[in-house]
Amino acid sequence: MIEFGSDYHLCGEKHIGGNTLFDVFPNVRLYASGRHAFSALLGHHDWKRIWIPAYFCYEVITHIEQLHVTVKLYNDFPNNPNVKQTIESLPTQEGDVLLRVNYFGIDLGAQALDIDIPIIEDHTLGLNSEWAKSSTADWCIASLRKSLPIAIGGMLWSPKQHTLPQSVELANEVVELADKRYEAMSLKTAYLNHQFHKKDVFRNLYIETEQQIETLQVSGLDNRTIEIIAHLNIETWMNAKTANWGTAHR
């Protein structure tokens, strides 16, 4: 058995045609990462505090704290049966915003909430879930590279049709970084096909570029990644991921 890790290889060719992410979510802003989507959204508003589930990516929490917004944590986790009660009892105040997280598309979180502050939802791991597609949140965010076979990418949209932040330009450093990650993805494909045997080569590229993503200035998304998203059948891709999960857990 070949050890191959969790970073995607180039594997979207079998899933071309049909409904794409842009068909499901036609009015979006694209960024180099999910963190950039948070930066753009929080910079677009004057929120003072953001409530974030304690079960969340702490690298992203650290990034948000650097945006001069006070982070408040609340108790939420996958399949939390008490999430509605927990959120509605939070001591929120004017100037707050709440982050909900779609945990793997199987969560109970799509419940209507009786709160008086804006809601952001993170659908990174549930892009094709009914919750994501029928969301009534003020804003939604996703780190696309966590769910799709692409090198980089983040997305922001508003189910309530709020005005989106202005588009940002594509930075040269993002193009260079994406090229490196696509090189790593290509080498990994060759590795899985027994055509390349130096795993450390593409692993080092993944590690190097992962560190670079953390320091990028807010940027738009490169053309190669946009082209992949524009042709990738989101339904067959997500179904394949589900089938892979089932195979791994037999």
Model-derived features with residue positions:
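N-terminus-biased targeting/localization segments
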Residues: 1-10
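PLP-dependent aminotransferase-like
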Residues: 10-28, 32, 36-120, 126-128
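A conserved donor-nucleotide-binding helix/loop in the catalytic core
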Residues: 37-38, 100-112, 138-157
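Short, surface-exposed amphipathic charged segments that create phosphate/polyanion-binding patches used
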Residues: 87-92, 136, 156-157
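A short alpha->loop->secondary-structure connector
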Residues: 120-121, 140
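Glycine-rich beta-alpha loop elements in corrinoid/cobalamin-binding modules
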Residues: 124, 128-131, 136
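Active-site region of PLP-dependent enzymes
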Residues: 128-129, 139-142, 146-153, 157-249
